[in-house]
UniProtKB/Swiss-Prot annotation:
This is 6-phosphogluconolactonase. GO terms for cellular component: cytosol. The keyword Hydrolase applies. Pathway: Carbohydrate degradation; pentose phosphate pathway; D-ribulose 5-phosphate from D-glucose 6-phosphate (oxidative stage): step 2/3. Transmembrane segments: none annotated. Gene3D superfamilies: YVTN repeat-like/Quinoprotein amine dehydrogenase. Its EC number is 3.1.1.31.
Length: 331
């Protein structure tokens, strides 16, 4: 298995392309100059394209991924209705979802042969929209509206339109600020990191009564932390055993173990990391975690070790200015 790591640095308008080997070492393959401040990125389900959101001219760009070394070649672009904060796709590679914090909306762009061709739908009124997350069954889009302390739920229609479900939302505690999400591999639970109180909520997708229910809320900060809370990103290992979330003020990554059924998280430890970690990701082998420091202008590679999933630093690498996003592609 080959793996490529992509890092987005909006201040220098660059994507760095890295090869990740089995020992956790990164080798620079390419530096791509992007026509705009590049922020969110996602790889297409078929591994052939990288989709990126740019500003100040709000667009989604598509880059072809070379099958031999992961290098990028520009392929197409499509306009967006707001500054892109988060980007994702459905599991069949038919649609791109873009959440916009500043515009307070989520948009759906149709893909044709892997390329963005037209805007299909826009849902407004999502104050502080920070991500769009499709469930493993490809039916429901979870959209956290950070400033409203709610996660809105939409059914994805066959033609890409978003239809509000009943109930249309679930709510966090006041002042939590739901931000990013991941789903457990067993499809029974979702985990949401809350930016403003640096907590993680565990959502059961369907309890015995057929309802969505928050079954656990866990503080992700050390007991003696007294500064402003500013959580950012969250990811789970492919086997569902370990979960990680980062806080930018503390510049740390919190390590969680996940119960076998996915319903309970336990804090295992805290890993100091690059200054102001805005984004990170986990490789497909479950062996390595790569974190980006928005203020250090570096990325760090950590080995995931032992039954607790604790992190051991393997190396750090200079990237562009203000790195914010990390994605990993395996092929």
């Amino acid at each position: 298995m080959k793996q490529t790591v992509y890092t987005a640095s909006p201040e220098s308008q660059q994507i760095h392309v890295w090869s990740l080997n089995h020992e956790g070492t990164l080798t620079l393959v390419q530096v791509v100059d992007v026509p705009g401040q590049v922020q969110p990125m996602v790889v297409s389900p078929d591994k052939r394209y990288l989709y990126v959101g740019v500003r100040p001219e709000f667009r989604v760009l598509a880059y072809r991924i070379a099958p031999d070394d992961g290098a990028l070649t520009f392929a197409a672009e499509s306009a967006l209705p707001g500054s892109p904060t988060h980007i994702s796709t459905d599991h069949h590679g038919r649609f791109v979802f873009v959440g916009s914090y500043n515009a307070g909306n989520v948009s759906v762009t149709r893909l044709q042969d892997g390329l963005p061709v037209e805007l299909v739908d826009v849902v407004e009124g999502l104050d502080g929209c920070h991500s769009a997350n499709i469930t493993p069954d490809n039916r429901t889009l979870w959209v956290p509206a950070l400033k409203q302390d709610r996660i809105c739920l939409f059914t994805l229609s066959d033609d890409g339109h978003l239809v509000a479900q009943e109930p249309a939302e679930v709510n966090t505690v006041e002042g939590a600020g739901p931000r990013h999400m991941v789903f457990h591999p067993n499809r029974q639970y979702a985990y949401c990191v809350n930016e403003l109180n640096s907590s993680v909520d565990v959502w059961q997708l369907k309890n015995p009564h057929g309802e969505i229910e928050c079954v656990q809320t866990l503080d992700m900060m050390p007991a003696d932390f007294s500064d402003t809370r500013w959580a950012a990103d969250i990811h789970i290992t492919p086997d569902g055993r370990h979960l990680y979330a980062c806080d930018r003020t503390a510049s740390l990554i919190t390590v969680f173990s996940v119960s076998e059924d996915g319903s309970v998280l336990s804090v295992e430890g805290f890993q100091p990391t690059e200054a102001q970690p805005r984004g990170f990701n986990i490789d497909n082998s479950r062996k390595y975690l790569i974190a980006a420091g928005q203020k250090s202008h570096h990325i760090a590679v950590y080995e995931i070790t032992g039954t607790q999933g604790l992190l051991t630093e393997k190396g750090r690498y200079a990237v562009g200015q203000g790195p914010m996003w990390v994605v990993v592609n395996a092929y």
